[in-house]
């Protein structure tokens, strides 16, 4: 049997996914804490969702360094979602930055998003971001979005910055060999620049962005120029590495119509035979 070659896009997606699950369960998740004001008690949760503070700090550094991509976004935020990207159910989770000897509670808003403060103490202690949800139930995503956009609009500069932040966090949590593997496959250390869209040989090197609901269409617009984007379910694919599109270019999506309500049950057909009373068809 002939094996298909492993596509670079698949490898990058796989490695970033693995990186999100590589954060070690350290002492911060197992230590018992004193009952002090402001303490967030989440130690009873077995195998909680965790991410290293140093990886988050790498994302904060990249956000600051690349802020020109999305200058109107005031700060990097993080969003807690269901494992498959769906909205959370039930109560909002509790979160903290914690190490053996301290804990910094984090405040989540109604959309379960939050910001992470810079803390030299957290860096020095190799602290972790910990949620009181099991890691297989939720995930933490970066959130970069210019205020004032319509619900069906996305700005490509925001998506470019979000990609760079995600990659910075992923690299910080990957082993050295994995970073080198992806660098070699993409032939660049700037992974986000690799996603330039369709290739001359018919391939697709596009970055996938998830919307809020199932999509019907997605169109990239920049002045008089436009491009129909591929959609699949709730996601659309965007050539963020194609610099011919300005950072202010917008993606406008149309959502798929809601599924039709279930049709009423159909009554069985009635047939007649000569000299017989009506009977239902078989």
Features from the language model and the residues they span:
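Surface-exposed beta-loop interaction hotspot
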Residues: 123-189
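Bacterial N-terminal signal peptides
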Residues: 10-23
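Short, surface-exposed beta-strand/loop "edge" segments at domain boundaries and coil↔beta transitions
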Residues: 86-87, 103, 133-143, 227-228, ...
């Amino acid at each position: 049997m002939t094996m298909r070659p492993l596509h670079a896009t698949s490898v990058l997606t796989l490695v970033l996914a693995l990186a999100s699950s590589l954060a070690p369960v350290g002492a911060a998740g197992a230590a018992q804490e004193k009952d002090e004001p402001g303490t967030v008690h989440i130690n009873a949760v077995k195998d909680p969702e965790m991410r290293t503070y140093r990886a988050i700090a790498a994302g904060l550094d990249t956000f600051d360094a690349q802020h020109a991509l999305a200058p109107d976004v005031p700060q990097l935020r993080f969003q807690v979602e269901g494992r498959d990207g769906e909205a959370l159910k039930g109560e909002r989770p509790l979160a903290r930055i914690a190490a053996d000897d301290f804990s910094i509670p984090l405040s989540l808003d109604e959309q379960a998003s939050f910001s992470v403060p810079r803390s030299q103490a957290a860096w020095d202690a190799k602290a972790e971001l910990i949620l009181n949800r099991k890691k297989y139930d939720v995930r933490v995503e970066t959130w970069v979005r210019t205020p004032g956009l319509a619900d069906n609009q996305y700005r490509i500069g925001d998506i470019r910055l979000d990609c760079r932040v995600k990659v910075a966090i992923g690299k910080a949590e990957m082993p050295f060999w994995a970073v080198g593997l992806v660098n070699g496959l993409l032939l660049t250390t700037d992974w986000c620049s690799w996603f330039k869209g369709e290739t001359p040989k018919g391939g697709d090197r596009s970055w996938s962005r998830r919307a809020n609901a199932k999509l019907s269409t997605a169109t990239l617009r920049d002045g008089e120029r436009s491009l129909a984007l591929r959609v699949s379910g709730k996601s659309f694919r965007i050539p963020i590495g194609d610099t011919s599109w300005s950072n202010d270019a917008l993606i406008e999506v149309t959502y798929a119509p809601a599924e039709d309500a279930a049709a009423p049950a159909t009554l069985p057909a009635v047939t007649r035979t000569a000299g017989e009373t009506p009977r239902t068809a078989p």
